[in-house]
């Protein structure tokens, strides 16, 4: 079993609280865009936002991965956006873990602000699809590591 660290440096166990989801089967692009969106929010506000994404009522702005992504009239500043429901569910699980960890440490979970949010590449699942004439085509799938670090404000 591998031992995973965190990409956040300067972690203080008294002040900070953290949670992670390792090797989650979601899109790396959607995971990155959600991480950029929720960084700086309180945990309660981020949960409300992602529940809206899950119900396909609130779009997430796609800043980097925006080719062939439709425009959303609800977005301000960045016109391209989408509803990454699967990634939002994964982030909601990690956010609820972060909230529980904050309560366990004695922090006020309503005042915890997300100071570090990351969604980066994990392990690659390699699969091959058989084709005609004895050939095969690769069908690789990238897993994602999700990290959240919060601090009481």
Regions picked out by a protein language model, each given a short descriptive name:
Residues 26, 132-133:
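Short, solvent-exposed beta-edge and connector elements
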Residues 64-65, 127-129, 143:
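Surface-exposed beta-strand edges and their flanking turn/coil or helix-capping segments
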């Amino acid at each position: 079993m591998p031992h995973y660290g965190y990409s956040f440096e300067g972690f203080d166990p008294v002040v900070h609280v953290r949670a992670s989801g390792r090797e989650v089967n979601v899109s790396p692009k959607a995971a990155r865009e959600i991480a950029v969106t929720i960084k700086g929010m309180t945990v309660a506000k981020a949960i409300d936002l992602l529940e809206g994404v899950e119900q396909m009522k609130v779009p997430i702005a796609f800043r980097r991965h925006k080719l062939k992504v439709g425009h959303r009239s609800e977005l301000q500043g960045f016109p391209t956006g989408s509803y990454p429901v699967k990634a939002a569910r994964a982030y909601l699980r990690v956010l609820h873990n972060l909230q529980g960890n904050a309560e366990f440490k004695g922090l006020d979970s309503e005042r915890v602000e997300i100071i570090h949010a990351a969604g980066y590449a994990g392990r690659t699942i390699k699969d091959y699809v058989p084709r005609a004439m004895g050939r095969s085509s690769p069908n690789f799938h990238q897993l994602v590591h999700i990290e959240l670090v919060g601090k009481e404000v």
